[in-house]
């Protein structure tokens, strides 16, 4: 007589087998990061993989502060540096999605003060140009670097709107027609510009009639369920924050104080990999959060479209399709570089490096946050291997 196995038992055994396989896979990638982050001279990091549009794995390794024994966990905040910009742009794109602005509107139609390139005073600057770094505005690094609150640390005492006005208007304390503006007209050349995103922060405030932080908390973070994301140190209700570390070749990592700067919408967000995953999930799931539409599908399509192919062939709205190659600086052999271009963003600030990217078609994404800098070729190669491992983990769920 043939013996039969009940269907319920088969389902139970299959479910158990799948769960064990997933657990084993997660153990493998966890072991990889545990064994390799120190080899790359990384002090502390958070990583995450998104598969099939959902967060499938995250890990935290190393220390918040070198040699402190205070370990990074999944709730530890990391400084985003320029990976802040996609979050800032969400605020602008939400207003666009609601019909409160058009991307090709002149920004001066919304500002209480006027911003124009003195070399082309009649040429309008638009939201699209600011989002794509084609506005003809420039970073004056002498001014920009001098306003970091290092070495003492803390939030900047200089208010955003005042700073931006003094930077872009004639007669302002930080105004320089030679250093703050390009010789090319708006929309005619590409040059990455942090101050353009500070200006977007001011525009968001003036359109919404709220502070940047208040608007982002209520209109972006709350609906996206980002409960551990902050713009200012003074807002953070805990001390679970990764300290930034500058690499000093002879003496070893130098621990920096938590710092800030007045152009904070361009880089000062502190958040976790789990919170930032909500942003990538929004892009991957075409504007939906938990099956609820947060941005229209056509808004996401606009977001991810190359905007100025003749002068910036990889640049979408905020996202760049060549970010990984740019991030790795091409210092490793070509075989280590991705051939397929994906939307992403990288971030660098004193003592901090961040990288996020995603594949809208395969519904995968990865996140890496560091509280130290990678300067050695060996470290860059390990970093690239980490990216590949995270994508591999993401694809298992897709």
Question: What spans do the regions from the language model cover?
Answer:
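Short, well-ordered beta-strand elements
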Residues: 353-358, 362-372
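Sec-dependent signal peptide cleavage junction
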Residues: 20-33, 155-159, 396
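Extracytoplasmic/secreted proteins, especially bacterial periplasmic and envelope-associated proteins
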Residues: 24, 28-32, 82, 87-91, ...
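Short active-site loop at a secondary-structure junction
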Residues: 38-46, 67-130, 182-196, 264-267, ...
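Short, gly/Ser/Thr-rich active-site loops of penicillin-recognizing serine hydrolases
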Residues: 311-313, 322-325, 369-398
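Short, surface-exposed loop or secondary-structure junction motifs
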Residues: 65, 119-346
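Short, conserved catalytic-motif segment at the N-terminal edge
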Residues: 24-78, 175-181, 252-256
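Bacterial Sec-dependent N-terminal signal peptides
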Residues: 1-25
